[in-house]
Each structure stands twice: as C-alpha cells, then as structure tokens.
Amino acid sequence: MCDDDETTALVCDNGSGLVKAGFAGDDAPRAVFPSIVGRPRHQGVMVGMGQKDSYVGDEAQSKRGILTLKYPIEHGIITNWDDMEKIWHHTFYNELRVAPEEHPTLLTEAPLNPKANREKMTQIMFETFNVPAMYVAIQAVLSLYASGRTTGIVLDSGDGVTHNVPIYEGYALPHAIMRLDLAGRDLTDYLMKILTERGYSFVTTAEREIVRDIKEKLCYVALDFENEMATAASSSSLEKSYELPDGQVITIGNERFRCPETLFQPSFIGMESAGIHETAYNSIMKCDIDIRKDLYANNVLSGGTTMYPGIADRMQKEITALAPSTMKIKIIAPPERKYSVWIGGSILASLSTFQQMWISKQEYDEAGPSIVHRKCF
C-alpha cells in the first residue's frame, strides 16, 4: 500500500494533545506531534536567525522556554481556527510531505461535538487545502474497529475529552453516549496544583509540559485509593524522584496516584460529575436490556489517558461492584491503545466498501458544509 500511489488516503487524528497522522493501510501513524502552536514571548535581536512568528508541534515543544504555547483544540473542540490551519498545514507539508489536493483525507472528531465544528473542518479541508474528498469519523468508533470488534462500549480518554460510546453491531447508540470534559490536560493541571502543595512551583505554559511528562512517567491508578493513601503516609515505598531539565531532582509520593484518581472522583477538581466507572455503567444502563451483556463483556479502553498502569484492574473492580453479580465483565486494554483511533481510521479508510462513503469535492460544491451531517454518522 505504501508506494504512495496517487490515491492513498490520509488519516489525521487531531487530538486535543497530539496529532496522529499518516497513510491509510499503514499499521501506525507516520507523524505524531503535539497539537501546539507557540509564539515567541521575547524580542528577537539576532539578525539572520530565521526566527518565525510561530512554531508548530515538536519545534514549539523544543523551543518552549522562549515561547507561549497554545493548544488550538480544547476539550475536543477546535477553539482557534487560524492555529488549527497552521497545524494541518504543518501536518500535510512538513510531516507527511504530501499535497493534500491529491489525497482523500479522513479526520476524526469527539462525539457530541457542536455541529458548527464539523462544518468548519469540512469547509477548511475543501476550500483551503482543496482535498478531493474527506470524511469525519467518530473517534471511539474507530477504536472499536482497531480492536477488531463490532460490539462493545469504548471508554476513550485523551487529552481533552473522555467519552463512553456503546456500539452494537457497528451502530453507535447516540442516546447512551456519555461525555465527560475531564481528561489528560485537567489531570496535568491538577498535578501542577498538588505539586505546589509540596513546594514545587509550576506555572508557565512551558512548565506545564514538564508536569505532563512527570504525569506520563510516574503516575498510576491505585486499586484501592484509601489503602494506597495509608501506605503512602506510613512508608516511603511509593516515592519516586524525577530530574527536572535544570538538573534539580524532585520527589513525588502520593501525588502519583492522587492525580489519576480524579478520573474516578471528579470532585477532586471540583467537578460535579460521575467518575469514568459510573459513566460507563450509566451508559450501559441507557442501552436496551438485551444488549447490555455484550457491552459488559467488551469494555474497550482507548486514548492516552487510559495508559496509566492499574487503570484496567480498577475499572474491572469498580464496574463489577456496580453491575449485577452474575454478569461477566471484561476490560480490554490493547497495548497500542494510545493510537487505536488512528489505527481504526487507517483500517476504515482502506476498506473497499468505505470508498463510496467519502464526501467528494463535487458533493461539497453542490451542498455546502452541511453535507457532513448527512454523509458522516
């Protein structure tokens, strides 16, 4: 598939935290970079340094010390279209090195997003990048494809949004979708806050990236939160150290599991919402009684925020406590779940049966951006 023939479709999973992009038919994305646009916060004095007024992705990340970093996608919704266009431009021309006008493009979106978001995406793809065809798929549905199932309930949690999507025989059940605007970025913010209690101050947008790294390397989900807190209080067995970029070493203890515990107890950050185990259960209970058994047996985790060690065991324990006692409950945590949305997109876009699903440039010209609601689930 990779002789990059004229027609290979592009798959671009625009997450709130990471952009995953590549070619349909590949088994992993070619480009994975942060969804960041950085602008200098200082005056340039060196002439001929080729300083730019904005940096995207990894380059912004590496120069973060002198930049103000902004994420154009918040809670799965694109809030800054000019920056988003920069990110897409960077994806096509610098990362994948393709001409978008030659490739059909599959984009992804969180469920229950505002309709306008999807229309504007469609408009930019056709009018700015002149793609020949495009499609917008729901992220959780793609994750289920990637796990090789057609029935299951997906818990997809990324950097910006967490949602439970029950899918039966390939149909998402929109009335039972639960969306929780609590995800990786909120956990990073919370970790910044509780590290301050230890006397470590992290405030700038660049320092937030350091905390995100601490979170990804050291945090885990406790099977029993109260027990773990007691253990942490009585011994130092749970403490780990982390070296900051300037060589200073900091120690973190109970923060390691207090941070992701927020997923199960959103009240930690003042959110009046059920935890991810309850939203999963509530979502199943909103489905028809006949299909619940199949959903309980196929809880699929997807997205970077489900990568914490211990999260699958904890989900198993919590859902078992809520469900009927005889129910068989299975949590599926594929090792590649960080990219399963992208992998599902790659599978979908390379299916021969999918080829009639694309929205073509011609259809767009005739109907305008609203066609996306008719053609894409």
Swiss-Prot record:
Positions of modified residues (Tele-methylhistidine): 75
Predominant location: cytoplasm
N-acetylaspartate modified-residue sites: 3
The UniProt record lists the keyword Iron-sulfur: no
Keywords for this protein: Acetylation, ATP-binding, Cytoplasm, Cytoskeleton, Hydrolase, Methylation, Muscle protein, Nucleotide-binding, Oxidation
Modified residues (N6-methyllysine): 86
Positions carrying N-acetylcysteine: 2
Catalytic activities: ATP + H2O = ADP + phosphate + H(+)
Xref: InterPro entries: Actin, Actin/actin-like_CS, Actin_CS, ATPase_NBD
UniProt-recorded name of the protein: Actin, alpha cardiac muscle
Species assigned in the record: Takifugu rubripes (Japanese pufferfish)
